[in-house]
């Protein structure tokens, strides 16, 4: 399973003016390569617009989790967000197709599915007031745990991070006999330090950050 980062802009949320400031939120921690790419993008925007468009980045989840970002885009507090499929499924539930465990064996599988699904997903995003600006891949999702896990049964002894507010996945974990612990993603580190959780799944880039 591969996680995607996508950047969206709400229709008509930014008025036309001589100087436009685009407010963009992301979970990417400040100082990481991920954050650096957004800074570079902002510099390109500034150069291309002759300084009339400036990108203001809110990194590290300072304005909240991805669901908060989506909500704040809808009410115009921010204009864009670099989000994963977790945030996207809040807008268009069909993005949950990318969550299915072991459904994708390689990059070709991902590309083939995306080629078929993306036109309809983009249309549904636009119907909900969002525009896709960029689609990028950050890598495969892995499990990170406080002790070795070799089988799905081993994972049943762990306290598993789940995204706060994602009730459907929380119920699925519970129904399968696991122990989900809903948390905001910005609280993963403190949750690990206090023992509130001891396992989570993400891409290596985010885990190292």
State the predicted function of each range.
Residues 108-122:
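A gly/proline- and charged-residue-enriched helix-loop-helix capping module
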Residues 4-12:
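Sec-dependent N-terminal signal peptides
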Residues 7, 18-108, 125-209:
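N-terminal secretory/targeting leader peptides
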């Amino acid at each position: 399973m591969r996680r995607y980062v996508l950047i969206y802009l709400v229709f008509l949320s930014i008025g036309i003016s001589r100087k436009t400031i685009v407010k963009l939120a992301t979970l990417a921690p400040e100082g990481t390569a991920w954050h650096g790419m957004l800074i570079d993008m902002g510099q390109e925007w500034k150069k291309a617009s002759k300084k009339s468009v400036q990108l203001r980045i809110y990194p590290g989840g300072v304005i909240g989790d991805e669901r908060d970002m989506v909500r704040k885009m809808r009410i115009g507090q921010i204009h864009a967000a670099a989000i994963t499929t977790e945030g996207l499924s809040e807008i268009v539930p069909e993005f949950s197709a990318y969550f299915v465990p072991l459904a994708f064996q390689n990059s070709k599988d991902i590309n083939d599915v995306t080629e078929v699904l993306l036109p309809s997903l983009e249309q549904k995003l636009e119907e909900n007031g969002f525009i896709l600006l960029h689609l990028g891949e950050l890598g495969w999702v892995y499990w990170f745990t406080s002790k070795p896990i070799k089988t799905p049964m081993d994972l049943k002894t762990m306290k598993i991070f789940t995204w706060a507010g994602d009730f459907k996945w929380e119920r699925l974990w519970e129904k399968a006999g696991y122990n989900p612990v809903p948390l905001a993603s910005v609280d993963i580190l403190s949750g690990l330090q206090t023992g509130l959780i001891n396992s989570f799944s993400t891409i290596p880039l985010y885990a190292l950050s």
